[in-house]
Design a protein with these regions (language model features):
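ABC family nucleotide-binding domain
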Residues: 5-195
Length: 195
């Protein structure tokens, strides 16, 4: 691990909800290209930990350094850092009134990171990468659970993140759909994505 760049450094991370101490002093380094799994029983703080890494949950103590910047510092523009952190949730969170391609293009265009033309090209590339090029004009309700999750992954990849966080990405899927999502995650890991 020492020969790789540390991408995320967590120091004594704490998170409490009222008197319930969910995270109590987590310290870890996550290096570029590394794949890390957080394993534990239901209610043990796994989702809280992941959500803390991009400040969707604000820690009550400790530090999180992302690419060397302390993102827990209130002076830091967290939205700039969130653009580099892809997040895939248990639920797909796709916009039902937008096509698959529009869902993928939305953030890069709205944040002015790409023109519509660039985002369209990127969306086509990502749809091919996740094995769904024929679904560009489909709406989310026309897709299976596995297809929706692959689109959610493509949407996160559209921002060209440095790291991808997955919060139980297969738990809401039928058993036969799990394999296609795990295969995509395996391909991402093999390509060097930090996860």
């Amino acid at each position: 691990m020492s020969d790789k760049n540390v991408l995320i450094q967590v120091k004594d991370l704490k998170k409490a909800f009222g008197t319930n101490q969910v995270l109590d002093g987590i310290t870890t380094d996550i290096c570029q290209g590394e794949v890390v799994a957080v394993i534990g029983p239901s209610g043990s703080g796994k989702s809280t930990f992941l959500r803390s890494l991009n400040l969707l949950e604000v820690p009550t103590g400790g530090q999180i350094l992302f690419e060397g910047t302390d993102i827990t510092d209130p002076k830091v523009d967290i939205n700039r850092h969130r653009q580099k952190i892809g997040m895939v949730f248990q639920q797909f969170n796709l916009f039902p009134h937008k096509t698959v391609k529009q869902n993928i293009m939305l953030a890069p265009v709205e944040l002015k990171l790409m023109t519509k033309e660039e985002a369209s090209k990127k969306a086509d590339e990502l749809l091919a990468r996740v094995g769904l090029p024929d679904k560009a004009n489909a709406y989310p309700d026309m897709l299976s659970g596995g297809q929706k999750q692959r689109i959610a992954i493509a949407r996160s990849l559209a921002m060209n993140p440095d790291v991808m966080l997955f919060d139980e990405p297969t738990s809401a899927l039928d058993p036969e759909m799990v394999g296609e999502v795990l295969e995509l995650m395996k391909e991402l890991a093999q390509s060097g994505m930090t996860m």
